[in-house]
Curated annotation (Swiss-Prot):
Lineage: Eukaryota, Metazoa, Chordata, Craniata, Vertebrata
Record family assignment: Belongs to the ORM family.
GO cellular component assignments: endoplasmic reticulum membrane; serine palmitoyltransferase complex
Protein name listed in UniProt: ORM1-like protein 1
Subunit-structure text: Ceramide-sensitive subunit of the serine palmitoyltransferase (SPT) complex, which is also composed of SPTLC1, SPTLC2/3 and SPTSSA/B.
C-alpha cells in the first residue's frame, strides 16, 4: 500500500465518470431515488416519476453545470478554477463515452417519466422544461459560455 502517494491525474475531476462501476452506481442511485419516492404513500405513480426526473435533472444541473472548480488542490495552476465539472470532464474532449452517457441518461429518464405519466400535459411540460435545462448546457456550442454573465466568476 502506498501511503502518502499522490494520484497520477492532474485533475481527478476529468476522469471520475470513467471509473470502474460508476455508470452502474449512477443508474442504481437513480433507481433508488425512484423507489424511495414510490414508497411515499401520498405520491401517485405519475408524481413519483415526475419528481424522479426533476430531482435527477436538478442534481445533474447543480453538480455538472453550476459548480465550478475542483475540490482538490491541483497542479494545473488554477486552470480548472473557472470551469464547470462538465467542461472539465474528459479534459474537455467532446463526444466521449462518459459525456454520451451523461447526455442520454436524462433523455431515457424523460421518456420513462412521459410514458408513466401517460403524457399528461402538466407533467409533460414540467418534464420537458427539466430536460431542456440539463441538455442545453451540454451542447458543444456552449462550452465555456456564460449566458448573461451568470456563473462567470
Amino acid at each position: 500500500m502506498n501511503v502518502g502517494v499522490a494520484h497520477s491525474e492532474v485533475n481527478p475531476n476529468t476522469r471520475v465518470m470513467n471509473s470502474r462501476g460508476m455508470w452502474l452506481t449512477y443508474a442504481l442511485g437513480v433507481g433508488m431515488l425512484h423507489i424511495v419516492l414510490l414508497s411515499i404513500p401520498f405520491f401517485s405513480v405519475p408524481v413519483a416519476w415526475t419528481l424522479t426526473n426533476v430531482i435527477h435533472n436538478l442534481g445533474m444541473y447543480v453538480f455538472l453545470h453550476a459548480v465550478k472548480g475542483t475540490p482538490f488542490e491541483t497542479p494545473d495552476q488554477g486552470k480548472a478554477r473557472l470551469l464547470t465539472h462538465w467542461e472539465q470532464l474528459d479534459y474537455g474532449v467532446q463526444f466521449t463515452s462518459s459525456r454520451k452517457f451523461l447526455t442520454i441518461s436524462p433523455i431515457i429518464l424523460y421518456f420513462l417519466a412521459s410514458f408513466y405519466t401517460k403524457y399528461d400535459p402538466t407533467h409533460f411540460f414540467i418534464n420537458t422544461a427539466s430536460l431542456l435545462s440539463v441538455l442545453i448546457p451540454k451542447l458543444p456550442q456552449l462550452h465555456g459560455v456564460r449566458i448573461f454573465g451568470i456563473n462567470k466568476y
